[in-house]
Curated annotation (Swiss-Prot):
GO molecular function: cyclin-dependent protein serine/threonine kinase regulator activity
Subcellular location: Cytoplasm; Nucleus
Annotated ranges, domain Cyclin N-terminal: 16-148
GO biological process: positive regulation of mediator complex assembly; positive regulation of transcription by RNA polymerase II
Name of the protein: Uncharacterized cyclin-L1-like protein C1296.05c
InterPro entries: Cyclin-like_dom (IPR013763), Cyclin-like_sf (IPR036915), Cyclin/Ssn8 (IPR043198), Cyclin_N (IPR006671)
GO CC terms of this entry: cyclin-dependent protein kinase holoenzyme complex; cytoplasm; nucleus
SUPFAM superfamilies, sorted: Cyclin-like
Keyword line: Cyclin, Cytoplasm, Nucleus
Entry superkingdom: Eukaryota
Origin species: Schizosaccharomyces pombe (strain 972 / ATCC 24843)
Transmembrane segments: none
CDD domains in UniProt: CYCLIN_CCNL_rpt2
Similarity annotation: Belongs to the cyclin family. Cyclin L subfamily.
C-alpha cells in the first residue's frame, strides 16, 4: 500500500511489554473515554478526536500509563491532536475539561458538588498548564515527532463507494460506530488503517445480515485472518469494558493499589 495509507504501528515486542504492566489496558480504555468526551465538550472535529485517540494509544503502548499521569497524557494528546488537525482548542479549556472529567470519574457525588473551572491565573491552572506542556514534549519525543495519522473512517467510505454500498445508510452508520470504538482500542496500533476499515465493514455487514462479495477485502490488501482477529478483539472490548470501568474506579479511589 502507499505510504499515505499507513502510519506507525506497534511491534509485537512493544505489545508484549505493554501487557506486562498491571492495569495498562484498563487505563488506556479510560483515557480514550476521556478523550472522546473532551472532544464533545471542546467541540473538536471527529477527525481531530480520532487523531488524539491514536496518538494517545501509540504513546501509551510505548510507555504504559500510571494513574497519576493519565490526565496529563490525555491533555497532551488532545493538545497535539488539535494542533495537528488545526482545530481550535485553548490550553486553558483543555486543562479544565480534563480536570473536570477526572474529578467526575473519581467522585460519585460530583454532580451534586459541582465543578468550578480554574481561572487562567490560578495556581491550579498554572500547575495544569505546566504538566500539559511537559507531557506534550515527552509524548512528541517518544513518537520521534511523528504525528502522521491516517483516519480509517475515510478509507471505509472509499471502500464502501468502491463496493457500491455507500447508499446503505445503516451499513455506513454501523461501520462508522465500529471504527469509533476501534480507535479506543489497541486495534489502531495493531493493524494498518486499511485493514481496520475492512474489519469494521465486515462486522457491520454481519450485524445487519448483509452478504458481501467473496474475498472483497483482498482488493484492499486485507486478509480473512486479519478480519477475524479484528472482530475478536473488538467483541472482547465490548464484553470487558464495563468490568474495566469498575476496576478503574477502585484504582482511582485507592481501594486497589496501582
Amino acid at each position: 500500500m502507499a505510504d499515505s495509507l499507513v502510519h506507525s504501528l506497534a511491534s509485537s515486542s512493544q505489545l508484549e511489554a505493554f501487557d506486562s504492566f498491571e492495569y495498562a489496558e484498563e487505563l488506556c480504555t479510560l483515557g480514550s473515554e476521556w478523550i472522546q468526551e473532551a472532544g464533545v465538550l471542546l467541540n473538536l472535529t471527529q477527525n481531530c478526536v480520532i487523531v488524539c485517540l491514536i496518538l494517545f494509544r501509540r504513546y501509551c503502548t510505548l510507555y504504559p500509563p500510571r494513574v497519576p499521569d493519565l490526565d496529563a497524557i490525555v491533555m497532551a494528546c488532545v493538545s497535539i491532536g488539535s494542533k495537528t488537525t488545526e482545530t481550535p482548542a485553548s490550553v486553558q479549556d483543555i486543562c479544565n475539561v480534563v480536570v473536570y472529567l477526572k474529578e467526575r470519574f473519581k467522585d460519585t457525588n460530583f454532580e451534586a458538588r459541582g465543578f468550578i473551572a480554574h481561572d487562567l491565573y490560578s495556581e491550579e491552572m498554572y500547575s495544569s498548564r505546566n504538566r500539559l506542556s511537559n507531557m506534550e514534549l515527552e509524548v512528541l519525543r517518544a513518537l520521534n515527532f511523528d504525528t502522521h495519522i491516517v483516519i480509517p473512517h475515510k478509507l471505509a467510505i472509499h471502500y464502501l463507494q468502491t463496493l457500491q454500498l455507500i447508499d446503505n445508510k445503516k451499513l455506513l452508520q454501523i461501520t462508522w460506530n465500529f471504527l469509533n470504538d476501534a480507535s479506543r482500542t489497541r486495534l489502531c496500533v495493531l493493524y494498518p488503517p486499511f485493514s481496520l476499515a475492512c474489519g469494521c465493514i465486515a462486522m457491520a455487514a454481519r450485524v445487519i445480515g448483509m452478504k458481501l462479495p467473496k474475498d472483497w477485502y483482498r482488493v484492499f490488501d486485507t486478509t480473512k485472518e486479519e478480519i477475524d482477529s479484528l472482530t475478536s478483539i473488538l467483541e472482547n472490548f465490548y464484553k470487558t469494558s464495563a468490568i474495566a470501568h469498575k476496576t478503574l474506579y477502585l484504582i482511582f479511589t485507592e481501594q486497589v493499589s496501582a
